[in-house]
Amino acid sequence: DELYPRLNSLTLLARQYDIGINIDAEEADRLEISLDMLEKLCFEPELAGWNGIGFVIQAYLKRCPFVIDYLIDLASRSRRRLMIRLVKGAYWDSEIKRAQMDGLEGYPVYTRKVHTDVSYLACAKKLLGVPNLIYPQFATHNAHTLAAIYSLAGQNYYPGQYEFQCLHGMGEPLYEQVTGKVADGKLNRPCRIYAPVGTHETLLAYLVRRLLENGANTSFVNRIAD
């Protein structure tokens, strides 16, 4: 009763200026309520015919492929093309700790990074398979993952098929190769830059998460893949 009216108001404002809006809760225990709000939003009469509604999914969640199936069905039922931002996930430690504290039989996330990497590619393939219903947004700073998606998407690229995304100030050398011209030996694919905006108090926690997420990627070998 409190959250949805705010979300709806914000989405209507986004439509007024034709700015896409993604629902991103991240934590596994907020997934259901996030999907409930997304479904309600997709059937708002005032938002009919607008393809600026999006959702963020985390590849480290074991439910991720099934969430994608639901999102594809939702896009079909609501007769719109949903933006789906695919990330690997930045709250692994919190998810593991919460599952342990709650005494769960298993974890909601994969416990090995290699499994998350494979999940990301499997989910990317599902998203690319329904271009009429899904606009994939691939958020990654991993060169191996990026190259695999480029290959999965095929060479018959057309504007609006998909996009890559990076965080402001991170992965710039990699994305210079992505957005450069084919004539210069580069990929010529779009990249959206995510730049956080807010107060110092709000941004500090975000910055710490990004530092923790990428703090281990300092060696030369890791930099090749990240």
Please provide the spans of the model-predicted regions.
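Positively charged, amphipathic and often flexible ligand-engagement surfaces
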Residues: 1-226
